[in-house]
């Protein structure tokens, strides 16, 4: 970016915005790029603004006042410019009260009694033009200054909120949601930019009302209060309508949230939706929700229409209430009438627009400031006291709990009870039932420099919490921790920040080439970096989406190792690595490169325990064992023999190792507890022995397993019962036997902060950071990286995508809190629209197509314009009648009569042109002519317009949804899910809520302005001649501005997204950031993103003001010309002069509003244009021509007639070539094979060999060339939906949508309950479903998070059985399954699918051993297709397809059933093995 010209611009250039001329010219001629945008002015730099406000806030906190005031801190920073701009605004508004006086003097100058003063009319008209000039010369800089000041306040608040976020303690992070934080910084703080311009009207409007009422009193006496009462009544009506809209908005938010949640699930699982052939039912589900949403949208739209129309219809109320009675009682005095009407125009704008807007602005602002004050006052992360002189690590009797809120509350209540004299009674009972369970209890250890401690233990035993305690994230309630303070940390879930791989490893540190290369080599990253197109400078996508899970884990480990620290905390860094890579890193990195460093490694592998200097074994937060491995063998022989005796313990999955370890520790601890009572810390109070509400608690655990608490509990639940109901978790901060009542989910034990709304619960920031809410909610975003990068194989990438994107959508659609989160999607979605091909404004064909979607809208517009033309014609006719009558009566009346009427006035002053009662017939004509432009649209003409546009919105949503669901996956794969969701969220919200009323306002204001110009032009044709060139100039100038303005707005939108992406990214890696002490580095990055956005936003505001400034100049010039022409061509008809000048003043007052509305409508029509682009997406099943229809029917007659097709399931593939995009490279090349009916074919190959691509080709989800036939029927001769329904699919990524379990099994409702229960029993789900409160009608949420991965796979099997599919496709079903569920899966395949053809894709050998034939693939080609016996001899092919670790397991596994158990196994081991065999069908939550 180049330096902004405003920095060197002189005063005139800044005042008239001449400095924007270069960017305006460039934007008009060519497309603007981000590099074309000027830098933000130095005064708007985020660091400067943040430092200034933070200084004042710290001063406020240090003042010692009971409650620090953010408003006072902001006032000390910004009060001077705020008051200065307010003063300019008041002077500019005050000129409006002088304008009617000059209008009255102009009319009075044409009084026959003041004929010598008629020459002053030119000067008075010129003075009126000067007043308008002075007004916009004051208002334009004032409004720009207020908007600029609002921008500065927003930037400063953004910065201090972000800085506070980096300081929040983990306990606080567990009480607030990510959605709340983002909503605070987006939907709320964004209001400062625009709404600050309304702030001063809170005091300007009352003053203006008083002044106008007093001046009207001088004109029409007591009737002035009637005018004020009439307009005030409209203000009360607006307040009532606003109040009525509240409940409707709340209901609409819930429905919108429900629709968007379901839409998000479908869009993120489009692959599965198409594979199952569920497009129609998914479309119906969303359509039903949308129907109810549109009904509420219509009600809200109607209320908004009446609210908006109050301004336009206010003139008629004033006329009826004040002007008409005065005219009927005292005759028509033109000076009084026109002056009064001019004041009433000022008054109606003040009462119906400015004052309500200002009150609403202050109400919203104060609520926002209070929220920010509360947020800034929250508890901060406290740095522990370190001793840099020591080199060892020591923990002494450390006890800690993640949430001591209930304990603190108890202490407070105890103190209050003591103060009140209550020592017993109910309070005592309360205390006996409430206890806090620490996550760590009396942990002691000591490590010398260079030693390695291996921490292992059961699930939820406190391993990660121990590391958090050492980091200082978890503050111990008792005990001491001593270490040097220089710590490096690698989190359990690899965290990748946006940037290059080198940036992620260096993490803001200086580059040391030797150290960097050593770390990369030790972490086994050399080959991966060499395969990347830009090596270690390859940019990472959000969350590292273009890296596999193992690659991300190694990058995160390299970051921790690169930092030179005294203590390294490594939280399960090998979770996603294969055995060979893990062994290399452990040897070369942990044991060699870091040999001189103190290391704490969380692991559950025996090999690591053997080589560690010390071992800490945790169970239920307590130290089960601490010492060396030989001491473990001698002191705990039962435990060590158990683990050492298990066959290939280190070779099974990490989840399974943890499960076995948990069961072992549980059994051993139970055996020990029979002989001795373990000591308990005084921290936990003994709970009551009698269980309370066990049945209710059991149901609660099933319904909401996320309620597993780290906080407190009212009840005692048997440990075995708790273990049975808890889901497996990779990361847990608490022992699994700790439960909590739902009333303790928030920070206040008296209130239920864990509120469920529409079946959802807000996710805390801590849960977001730790991913503690289970893997069931992990939803993966399929981005364009899936098809573009070759480093990560395609089939692996789908299973390795980070949870980051799904968490964004969770926060986006979480409406359980404040309603401001309704607009959160516009901020959270990281998608940036594709670069527009053109930089023109919205094309006219978009408007035409929008209107043509409902012909009723065209008829409504024609009707509106027709009525407006009739009213204009009637008004013009009335003007001629009035002026002719007045001219005739003026010449017929005698001077004495005129004097008589003049003396009849209450003030005794001679007023201009008092009309006799004989003219009362024409009174209505006068008022209709004056207020014609205000009533042009009428009352009932706007309501059909609003309802018709809402109907169009409904149709657009329906068409877009159908188009997306019907589009081929090859097209959808090139789009991010965020981009698709933006169309259904931000764009549809614009089209639903904002566009109808704004378009109506634009049409209405346009008719007002055009009607006024036509009226004055007809009365004085010379005005039309003067207006024509000015109108042409304005149209050209508008087009000139919009070319640049719309591009800058687009760039601003793109620059806004990284702000919130950075916030979300920082929250996810907050512990890593604080462990590395990189807060200042990330604050600098955040300020950089803020400055980038500020540059585009400030430039957009400046160019917009450039246009409005010149538009005002243009129309002030028009007003002055119109006034001079009216005065110069007058033929003793002061009524015409009054009408012309009044309407010209109305044009000036309405025009800028009309211009701003037109710009806003043009911007919103871009949302319509984007929706049309999605509607125009190609379809998978285009409608064929009639001629082709008949041919198709003839060729498919046999297949169509045979309702049992396919009956055998025979598959034949010939010369199949597959591409994911039409222009992409082939991922499968000339593939040919065949499978007989009922045959089981195993598909073997390395990740990326093309296994998943083959399944996609069979389902016609990709571009294909070649032939596939089932039972002799070619796929080109079969309808797409019927072809896909021939397959049953069990994908890697299981699709569980929000809705009843029954619908997830049988979406079309074709099967009875008996059939569903029978199938559930076949697949082993019956016992699971019976535990649900509503059985088959149990509501599944969040992708079925209450179900394990195994249960979801079984649901897919149940779907396949119910669908009657003859061919079953299983894509790596064992990837996330435990051994028990794998056995259930195998048994189901043998029994329920014995008559089906099965294609099983795996990269592991064991699940494939029961297959009859094997298709071995490599690099998209068939290497071998034969039996397992022959493949075992093809060692060269096996080496290419199977990893070394799996190759080691192949031969022992072949004859595992023939081996006898080793005699060394203890009875505990035998019991475990027997349970695994006996309880195959017992799948538990």
Curated annotation (Swiss-Prot):
Polar residues biased stretches: 1454-1473
- When this gene is knocked out, what is seen? Considerable lethality around 10 dpf. No effect on initial pancreas development, but at 16 dpf mutants display loss of pancreatic acinar tissue. At 22 dpf, most pancreatic acinar tissue has disappeared and has been replaced by fibrotic tissue that surrounds dilated, mucus-filled ducts. Morpholino knockdown of the protein in 48 hpf embryos leads to impaired resistance to P.aeruginosa strain PA14 and strain SMC573, as shown by the increased bacterial burden, but there is no effect on resistance to E.tarda, B.cenocepacia, S.aureus MZ100, E.coli XL-10 and H.influenzae Hib EAGAN.
Positions binding ATP 1 in this chain are: 402, 457-464, 492
Q: Which residues cross the membrane?
A: 79-99, 124-149, 196-216, 225-245, 300-320, 341-363, 857-877, 925-946, 997-1019, 1022-1042, 1104-1124, 1139-1159
Topology in membrane: Multi-pass membrane protein
Q: What is its EC number?
A: 5.6.1.6
Named from the GO MF annotations, one term is: ABC-type transporter activity
Alphabetized UniProt keyword annotations: ATP-binding, Cell membrane, Chloride, Chloride channel, Endoplasmic reticulum, Endosome, Glycoprotein, Ion channel, Ion transport, Isomerase, Membrane, Nucleotide-binding, Phosphoprotein, Repeat, Transmembrane, Transmembrane helix, Transport
Q: State the family named in the UniProt similarity comment for this chain.
A: Belongs to the ABC transporter superfamily. ABCC family. CFTR transporter (TC 3.A.1.202) subfamily.
Q: How does it assemble?
A: Monomer; does not require oligomerization for channel activity. Interacts with cse1l; this interaction may down-regulate cftr activity.
Question: What is this protein's record name?
Answer: Cystic fibrosis transmembrane conductance regulator
Gene name linked to the record: cftr
